[in-house]
């Protein structure tokens, strides 16, 4: 029988939490992200999420469909928007050939068009292209890169594309495994600013202590299968943990 990596741990994730997962190598930080994302099953315990909660996970292994440009790949973040675009195009094509303006079917078609336009606007359909370009540029891409195939970029740059997709999806929970690994200083600063104003919850693993300090407002330490939860960013957590250990020794 194997040894449990975690035992009896419990914590609650609230909107606005920006949690830094820390611990020694092999403590289970990336594994806990995979448990939260349901990429791996646990041998026991339960996780409870709101029914409609949307979760995005930046994994270390990224697999893109070949033949897409950077923009086309980034637009994969907007599956429903792209579907509605096709439906609107089809309805408008039908309307150009119709002359039965008084018929019930024509009225239904107009209503369908109105409903889809409202849904499209609600999803941000009129803004997503500009948002995509802004985030790609924030992560270091130039406009002239947008129409280049993703196949021509290194793994580090492909990770930036995947990160852009996650940021564009506006998930309720964002799970990030070493998001700064392949970023330059300018892109890291941009990402810090973006994540600080993120409306959902964030759980991240990073060896970049300054990034943790600048982004997180809560630290969870994993040690020997247990977790220790502090409502502090990384540096303040270190001070608090030191004070606690000093008191325990007294």
Predicted feature locations:
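ABC ATP-binding cassette signature C-motif
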Residues: 1-249
